[in-house]
Amino acid sequence: MKRFLQPARRSLLRAIPWLVLAATLPCLPQPMTAAAEPTPINRPWTGPYGGVPPFDQVRVADLGPALEAAMKAELDAVAAIAAHPAAPTFANTIEPLERATRDFERVQTIYGIWGSNLADDAVQKVEREMAPKLADLADRIFQNQKLFDRIKVVYETRKTAGLSPEQQRLAWLLHTDFVRGGAALDTEAKKEMAAINQQLATLSTKFSQNVLKDENDALVIIDDAAGLAGLPESQKTAAAAAAEARGQKGKWVIQNTRSSVEPFLTYADDRALRQQVFEMFVSRGDGGGATDNNTTIRQILELRARRARLLGHATHAHWRLENSMAKTPERAMALMEEVWGPAVAEVKQEVADMGQIAAAEGATITIEPWDYRYYAEKVRKKLYDLDESEIVPYLQVDKLREGMFHTAAMLFDLHFTPVPEGSVPVFHPDVTVWEVKDGQGKHVGLWYFDPYARRGKRSGAWMNAYRNQERFEGETTTLVSNNSNFVKAPPGEPTTISWEDATTLFHEFGHALHGLCSNVSYPSLSGTSVARDYVEFPSQILEHWLPTPEILSGYALHVETGKPIPAALVAKIKKAETFNRGFKTVEFLASALVDMKLHLSTPTADPDAFERDTLAALGMPREIVMRHRTPHFNHVFSGDGYSAAYYSYLWSDVLTADAWEAFTEAGGPWDPAVAKRLKSHVFSVGNTVDPADGYRAFRGKDPGTGALMRKRGFAAAAE
């Protein structure tokens, strides 16, 4: 989906993508026998705010050696814990494990930032070299029998050892993660699982690099200004700037990113160009050449299925959901199927409305996927007298950022101030840094903001925690980032974005606030370290403040006049808030259902055919494509994070819709009592409590699907 949290899973190996990295290796990497020489990246972070990443000292040549040194140091620390002569306790086993990851996590954070934001050929070479070694590190720890035996003792005695509830939960979490990582397998099964993880590590890296190459290299060049007919001036300017940056001055370029493609599909009058841009975008990873991902997908699915069977599960989906809120694939499927029918019915009405407008304009066409956004915008104009091009000039990134800060202050008493220029290193000139304090002036953390697309930056939008909040050995404050791919305006001009991108901006800021509000003892339980189908709840709830009158009137300011968005336009936005929800729900659910069915089925030899057949069986409207087609589905195949778990956005939205009604029932979006409960029971507790219990404490009840159906405009289905 447009939002991508990275990474959400935090436990002993908070920074190791141990099951998520993934072309098949003939053998395991050689054992680590000696540490590489430490580099500047390996040193503890110094400077203000409890230390900050030394981005100004990073050399790509140091990334591999730094990781090697950090991995060796972590293995040594783990070996010492496993060999401790005293009987296992929380203090001599679990807490030392929390310490053991810190040095490695600092290095892996920098490595991950370069891989996500600055992935040139040199960085990608390091990724290919290090992916299997990182997987090997994780296996060495999870399969350390002496270490697991100690963790098991602490886990089994957790309720009688005088541990706090948070300590008991951490003991449970570590034991659960070790079992899920193969710690309880016999020797031969452990070897097989390690071999599987090696192959998955390289395959997933290959998948993501193929997608990134297609996104970097593919583009549509427009030579004639007539091809820009219908586009707002801001998009024409951005396309001209993109062309100039690629040595095509005097022309216009549509880049292969969602923030460039979707506005073009919405406004461009030239149907043939819309089709060309659409086909470029949906063909990422599916071009039949060196970057084609279909064989890689088949290999990943086969390996995941083998691993699940080794661990005693029927399918990868059953293994994946064991520790989720949904618990089983069947429960996740039931929710998706409940929503699918009403959403498809809504799409049929949306298409009928489009057909009427097309016919009235004399267009004798059948609505195709590259027409949907274009004619949907015309329907919006007809039904609601609302044209999104009217809204875009009011959606300046910098002003919306201030609106997010206002939201954080009103809800959670968090206040943002830019750090003194040059006081905190950044990894790219586009990045800005803000100090966050609470209402008493106490330092809470730093927020890094990297809003613009660039070559080498993966697509989408995401939040990272560079450092987690913790306090079991003194207070450690968090460092979080939000990263987006907005098309940057020419120098000196404000960048404006679409309504959908503005919603994404607030969504990702919700993830950042989840990290900034964290108030826990142990880093493995901190911030966003929660179940995958819960982690999207704090982010999705924050989206609801964007369309509030206070945010729009105060921060949606016209890019030329500086005047606030007119009240009449705000009213139109409110009236049209459920417009096109059929399309949005179906394109998401199609991706989520294909993801789940891929991981419930016998691995397919032809992912493209599986996708087509599954969508046909579901009754997928021909006018829509999946939001993420399988060959570029980074959520699912560039790592394990959202595999068999893309449904999580819908599961979380059940909570989101119900939680928003808590505000409306209390009188409005700024109700202080509801906001206090939201912070106390959701945003601040991390993974210290079961998410179902945390939600119940906030809301006073369990959620149902009625609020979700009302939110999406499927009122009849909600009754």
Task: Give each language-model segment a name.
Residues 11-30:
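Bacterial N-terminal signal peptides
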Residues 47-62, 111-130, 153-195, 255-295, ...:
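Short His/Asp/Glu-rich catalytic/ion-coordination signatures at enzyme active sites or charged loops
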Residues 487-506:
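Short pre-active-site segment immediately N-terminal to the catalytic Zn-binding motif
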Residues 22, 36-237, 663, 719:
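N-terminal helix-rich structural modules
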Residues 37-60, 69, 229-230, 251-253, ...:
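C-terminal, non-catalytic "cap/extension" segments appended to globular domains
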Residues 1-11:
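N-terminal secretory signal peptides that target proteins for export/translocation
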Residues 166, 170, 202, 209, ...:
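Active-site-proximal, well-structured secondary-structure segments within enzyme catalytic domains
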Residues 72, 76, 80-87, 103-120, ...:
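Intrinsically disordered or highly flexible coil/loop and linker segments, enriched in small
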